[in-house]
Amino acid sequence: MNNPLVVCALKDEFGIKGLNYDVLYTGVGKVNAAIQLTEYLLKKGRPEYIVNYGTAGSKKVKVGSLVDCTKFVQRDMDVSGLGFKKYETPFEDGISKKIDFSAFENNPLNHLLTCATGDSFITTIGGHVGDVVDMESYALAKVCLKFDISFIAFKYISDSADEDASIDWVENLKKGQKLFKKTVLEVWNLF
């Protein structure tokens, strides 16, 4: 596990310096994440595996927890009016509505949670699938699936996806960085 690529939306979410591998900052949202990761892979080649780190909201997981996500869905994909299942992208061969990387080796946490990704910062959770919500992971997982690269996401639960979510998110950024460094990077000898 010597050649990872760590992918984050924002420098504010990661901010760990002195690493001997690449960290890619994609910007916020599914489109930015997919474009930036694909561009990186085409220019720099394949890393051994890709680790997404970032913050997430959850009603199911306690704020302040670091969790791993190995299953990913698009929470804002809804073409049910045309007879498709909710969260399923129409006319895609071989990709189910849920992308599953549960077989990722050397996972230090093994919660194997589902991350529901969409292009909105959630301040209320209602009717969404998944254990946690974010804005990039599904897109990153889909690129990894297409390029046949192992993928895992670690999410620091920064907020409860409620009316205080934006305040909680800012206050919890540094706590998440420290926990990710200790729980994942140091365990994998990547720091």
Residue ranges and their predicted role:
Residues 1-5:
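Extreme N-terminal starter segment of soluble prokaryotic enzymes
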Residues 12-191:
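Glycine-rich phosphate- or other oxyanion-binding loops that anchor nucleotides, phosphorylated ligands
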Residues 7-11:
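Structural motif
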